[in-house]
C-alpha cells in the first residue's frame, strides 16, 4: 500500500501545482505597456487605471480596442548528486541534471474600453482578462513528479527482482523502465468593469465602480511508467504505474472599486482601491484515476467514481486509513468532484503622481500594493508569502508633434517569495520590467498605439532536503522570461 500512498500524494501535488499564483493583471491598455505609470492618466485607459480621472477626460464618447500577444518561458532546473545510489549493489549513483522547459502562452488578448463624459459626470466600462491569464505546458513533466516516481520505481523493482534468480542483475534491471510525463494548465479570469465618476469641485473628483470576474481554469496531466524490454517478461506489458488527471475549475467573484483624483494646473494626484475579491471555484472532475501493478496484477482505481458514488467525505475517510493514505488523504480534497477551491484576487491599493513639464512632456510615478497574504489560495498557500506584492512604476511621455507621441517606462515587482511558496508549475520571480512604444494621431478622432515590453526576472534558487519523499537533496532554480507586444486603437466621437 505504500505505492498507493505515493501515487495519491502525487495526485494531491497536482492540486497545488496550479493552485495559486499572484492573480492580478494590470496591463490592459497599450498605453500601460509603453509607459507603465498610468495611475494618474485622464485618457481612455483611466477606465481601469484611474476612473476618477475621467472627470477631466474627453467630453462625450470615446472607445478603445487593444490587442496584446504575450509569450513566456517558465523553467525549472534541478541538480541531484548521487541519484539512484545503491551502496549494497556497489553503485554510487550519478549526478542528475535536467532543465524542465515550461512554455507559457496566451492567444491574442483583447481588451475593450468605453467612456462617456458630460460636464461633471462620466460613466465608463471595460472588458478584458483581469487576472492570471495564460496557458503553460511542460512536455516532459515536472520534477515534483518525475524525480520521486523514478526513485520509487527503481526501489520497487529492485526489491522485487532481488528475490528472483536475476538478483545479481537487480540494480541494472531495476532501471529498465520508461517514464512518460506531461503537465499543462490554464488560468483565466475574465472581467467586466463599470465606473461612475463625478467631479466634486473644480480640482477634486471621485469614482465608484465594480467588476464582475469569472474564473476559468483546468489542470491536465499524466505520469506513466512503462516496463522496459528486459523486465517486461517479469511484470508484463501493463504500466508499472499510470496516473491521469483532468479537472476543470470555474467560479465567480465581484470587486468593489473606489478612486479619487486631485487635478490642479500641472499636477495630478490619484488613488485607487480595489477590495479583495472572493472567488470560490467548483470542481468539474472529469478524470482522476490511478493504475498500479500489485501482487494480483495491474488494476485501475477510479477515484472520481468512488467519490461520486460514496461522497467526497466518505472517500477521504476511507483513504485516510493507515494502510492507505493516512494524513495525505486530506490533500485529495481539492480535486474531488464538486469540491470548492479558492482563487481570491487580492485587494489593491494604488497611489500615483503625474506632472506636466510642458504641454508636450509628461511624467508619472506610481506605487502598487497587492495584499496577497490575505487573499485565499488553494491549500492556504498565501500564508507562505513573507509579505504582499510591492510595485514601483515610473514613466515618461513626449509628444514629438501633433501627430506622434513616444513613451517609455519601468516597473519593479517584489512578491515576498519564500521557499515554501514556490512550486514547480506555479512559481514567481521578482522582476524589473521595461516598456516602450508610441502613438500616432491619424486624425482628430483616431489614435493608434503600439508597444513592446519585457520583464527581466531574478532567478530563484532553492535547496530541498529529502525532496518529494526521497532521500535526495535537490538544488533547484526557477527562471522566467516574458515578452509582450501590443497594438490598439482609440476612437473619440
Language-model regions: role of each:
Residues 15-135, 453:
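N-terminal, post-signal peptide beta-strand-biased segments of exported outer-membrane/organellar beta-barrel
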Residues 20-37, 41-42, 109-110, 117-493:
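Outer-membrane beta-barrel porins/channels
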Residues 9, 57, 458:
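Active-site-proximal flexible loops/turns
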